[in-house]
Amino acid sequence: MKKSRKILTLLMVMILVIGSLAGCKKDSNTTNDKTTGNNQKEATDTATPEATNTTPTDVTLKVWAPQEEQEILKEMCENFKTAHPEYNLTFDYGVVSEADASTELQKDPAAGADVFAFASDQTSVLVNAGILYPITLDVDKITADNAPASIKAATVNDQIYAYPFTPNSWFMYYDKSKYTEKDVLSLDDMMAKDLGDKVKNFSVDLDNGWYISAFFFANGGTLFGPDGTDPTSCTFNDEKGVEVANYLIDLAKNPKFLDEADNNILAALKDGTLAAACSGTWNADTIKEALGDNYAATSLPKIKINGEYKQLSNFADFKLIGVNSQTKFAVPSMQLAQYLAGEECQKLRFEKRNIAPTNIKLASDPDVLANPAVAALSLQASYATLQSSIPQMGNYWTPAQAFGAEVLNGTVTKDNAKQKLDDMVNSILSSIG
């Protein structure tokens, strides 16, 4: 009965999260409408081949996915091949992460993948570059099947450009032999606990903009305005931003803190020298194996600034599957992209890799809600900040990484924190040409 109530509670959280994420973001093109509109028209009129009813016999599709997806990708593509005997299909697999898809495609779109996975913050950039093929296959179905926020993340100027398949965010894993459920509500309480000389209490990747932003958002900071659409606004260098910088300086200096680097958290969790670490569902199986019976996952903790507890608010975005506008096989490419992002493959990813679904039906499945990592992701999503997808977002990552690195190496101090934050924000808001 207790388990049933817990699952029902998580189901209610999922419903609220889907609704709240859908409502918290306006159309990502409320600025620069003229430019975006012209670029979209150019992409549609000149760069995008017309879909035809001609069925090619021989079809070769280049498909990109990250390294950790390669095994299951091949299984899914073979299933697609079996289901489509009208094509003589050959697949050319490539290893490109979702984070790097836009960069690699812009080098030479014609040499890029026909079908590829990418992070939703790249949507506007890829559309403006004329690289994404406008989706015309079963638009009503994918809109009805997936969380509204995931559809918004794949949409530019009311046109869907990709198929969503998973929320992309992070939360906290912990060793429940070292922390109680009450302990993990507060990072300050976690760091104050004496777990032994050789044990690090907490780890997060501070020199990574995807992670460090959570601390600024927790204290009321905004990136590109309240709704992420203003390329001229970032408040990370205001008074509250300085408070965050001071908190990060203290955290980095704490001997109980471990900066995440090259997945060093996995070995530390396994040998018992780390009590809690931040990551996503992509590491769920490995961390579960490392922690064994002590495996637990939850939302991010609160941090205490000026005597007040502030909830860490991570970036929330989505992983999408798109089609190259220069593909020679538009219809088969869209069919494959739809299948790879569809309910069957989302379920397969969940079962084999603990990847959370965007499919509404799967998101409410009791097996999904009973999974600790997926449940933690769902809970944290209610505290998350939807990641901006405007082109200016591309300017954020390097300055944020550099600031985090300087916090770690000690060159950011409480005396120069304001100047260092000013430098970071000026770089973030600099013209992208």
Q: Residues of each region from the PLM?
A:
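Hinge/lid segment of periplasmic solute-binding proteins
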Residues: 120-171, 182, 296-300, 306, ...
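Extracytoplasmic/periplasmic substrate-recognition and gating elements
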Residues: 82, 289-352
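Extracytoplasmic/periplasmic solute-binding protein
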Residues: 161-165, 170, 188-234, 274
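A structural signal for short loop-to-beta-strand junctions that line the ligand-binding cleft
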Residues: 106-107, 111-114, 142-176, 200-204, ...
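Extracytoplasmic "Venus flytrap"/periplasmic binding protein-like
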Residues: 79, 83-146, 177, 182, ...
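Glycine-centered hinge/linker elements that transmit conformational signals in sensory
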Residues: 230-259
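Conserved N-terminal structural module of periplasmic/extracytoplasmic solute-binding proteins
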Residues: 6-10, 24-122, 304, 309, ...
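Long, aromatic- and glycine/proline-rich binding clefts that accommodate carbohydrate-like moieties
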Residues: 350-402, 406
